[in-house]
Amino acid sequence: MSLDISQFPVLAQANTPNELRQLPQALLPQLADELREFLLKSVGMSSGHFASGLGTVELTVALHYVYNTPFDRLIWDVGHQAYPHKILTGRRDRMHTIRQKNGLHPFPWREESEYDTFSVGHSGTSISAALAMAVAAEKEQAGRKVVAVIGDGAMTGGMVFEAMNHAGDLHNDMLMVLNDNEMSISENVGALNNHLAQLMSGRLYTTIRESSKKVLKGMPVIKEMAKRTEEHLKGMVVPGTLFEELGFNYIGPIDGHDVDALVETLRNMRSLKGPQVLHIMTKKGRGYEPAEKDPIGWHAVPKFDPSQFKKPATKPGLPTFSQVFGKWLCDIAEQDEKVLGITPAMREGSGMVEFSQRFPKQYFDAAIAEQHAVTLGAGFACEGFKPVVAIYSTFLQRGYDQLIHDVALQRLPVLFAIDRGGIVGADGPTHQGAFDLSFMRCIPNMVIMAPSDENECRQMLYTGYCYDAGPSAVRYPRGSATGATQVEAMTALPIGKGVIKRLGKGIAMLNFGTTLAAALTAAESLDATVVDMRFVKPLDVDLVKEMAQTHDVLVTVEENAIMGGAGSGVLELLQKLKMPKPVLQIGLPDEFIKHGSPEEVTHDLQLDAEGMLAQINAFLAD
């Protein structure tokens, strides 16, 4: 159910950027207030990313007011902060469907709107995309402008600096807006800096600056003195030296919540030549006190009533797999001070908060730099430490070369705790953990484990900790564990050995991971054998051979892409053993998995017990 737009009289007049640009500038502050209120209420109805969007309301209004979108290109980095953008670009009445099945995509998405010029989900991509669009605009002589909006958190990723280095060299016209919400706005980032930014972006300053360069072109000594003087004067009031060194003209910082100042500064910058940086200071969660005080806790929210100023109380329930990992990490760190925990900016999501607090000298946050996080683990392993890299499946993709070249090639004992393996749900195709078993299985020297419940997860983590002949990975899903009885003792599992969970006849289901419960349910109707394979690599050769010899049909089950996954490993083994056998592979199809609740996606892909049974019966009927 959408909100009553009559409660937002100015926002009602700005359903698209064209309508927004018809408004008098004097109404923009009221528009920003209404947009923020609309965002509060709509996310409360739908759930979703919350605090980031509250901090970009004024910026979003100003960008669409000054730039001729979608002709002018606007690229959002990651997209957590793009909810206001969606509201102002014709999707206002569908905001209550965001992140839901058949609803709006959680991030900017090209297929969804012409205003979403680049599909995003992983951080650090906006500058590269914007540079390409700026080069294309110049080649086509289109006269269009290009703007990328990137947060200070994404600036920790190396790809951003690679792109900036290239942009500074090519010198195409483009604007990079640095949305800095690391700290609250201080007195120095008020009227004085807003005035300074407008002066520095104005025609007079730019003309004098460029004319001086031409005059001094033939006098290198004087030119260098002038350059240093300019840097010294600017350095006293703006922290832009790094950007200037990379070839960008730096302007700011300015108050990112002063919509009039943003409009005037952006108007001035719109005509500037070459790559530009506008540094704005914002407050994540702006306008909603609980989110301002705890922007991390309010980064994303379930459905809630904003008027209550608190999120709904969570009912006591099963621990998540992330929490199971976090507890194990603390337990093992108590025993071994050489255990080091590494995360690429996912402390909360990966369950490492307690570990970071109790063992601060053993905790390393590599920031949004997955390549660095993986090789950091490799370096620690070289020196005799026990590195544990906690990383989401979708983000491990970004450190793939390092996994191969820096870890596996050297047989270094780095343990990868891979969270969010399989179906993630509402965040959609950019965040589903669909490919990790496939891209790890082909790497020599890797040991890959897939626990069926929280106890196996704990024992497998300990197995990886004890394994010193090379890298190992334990891959587990998002969300609550299965409810298995907790076993505190830690025992290393025999490498490459599975266990039979149910003896049947005719059909043997070889299960990899937490789909075991559904497989056991489906097996009851079929009187099938069910095997908890535990290890994706190395496979239990003897057990697979036994199942092939004693059953008519094999069924592999995994929450990973069928192509190249665990089931493919079983087929390869059967071929090697020269044992032809009908094999049905149940897993994720050859497509990007859309957003929806995990339960909806699992059902649609026939990965629940009902779906498995239907797939097996269809296979037998052919």
Curated annotation (Swiss-Prot):
One of its GO terms (molecular function) is 1-deoxy-D-xylulose-5-phosphate synthase activity. PROSITE patterns: TRANSKETOLASE_1 (PS00801), TRANSKETOLASE_2 (PS00802). Binds 1 Mg(2+) ion per subunit. Signal peptide: none annotated. Its cofactor is Mg(2+); thiamine diphosphate. Thiamine diphosphate binds at residues 80, 121-123, 153-154, 181, 288, 370. Its EC number is 2.2.1.7. Pathway: Metabolic intermediate biosynthesis; 1-deoxy-D-xylulose 5-phosphate biosynthesis; 1-deoxy-D-xylulose 5-phosphate from D-glyceraldehyde 3-phosphate and pyruvate: step 1/1. GO terms for biological process: 1-deoxy-D-xylulose 5-phosphate biosynthetic process; isopentenyl diphosphate biosynthetic process, methylerythritol 4-phosphate pathway; terpenoid biosynthetic process; thiamine biosynthetic process. Keywords: Isoprene biosynthesis, Magnesium, Metal-binding, Thiamine biosynthesis, Thiamine pyrophosphate, Transferase. It holds the Pfam family DXP_synthase_N. InterPro entries: Dxylulose-5-P_synthase, THDP-binding, Transketo_C/PFOR_II, Transketolase-like_Pyr-bd, Transketolase_BS, Transketolase_C, Transketolase_CS. GO terms for cellular component: cytosol. Mg(2+) binds at residues 152, 181. It catalyses: D-glyceraldehyde 3-phosphate + pyruvate + H(+) = 1-deoxy-D-xylulose 5-phosphate + CO2. The keyword Transferase applies. Homodimer. Catalyzes the acyloin condensation reaction between C atoms 2 and 3 of pyruvate and glyceraldehyde 3-phosphate to yield 1-deoxy-D-xylulose-5-phosphate (DXP). Belongs to the transketolase family. DXPS subfamily. This is 1-deoxy-D-xylulose-5-phosphate synthase. It comes from Shewanella sp. (strain ANA-3). The lineage of its organism: Bacteria, Pseudomonadati, Pseudomonadota, Gammaproteobacteria, Alteromonadales.
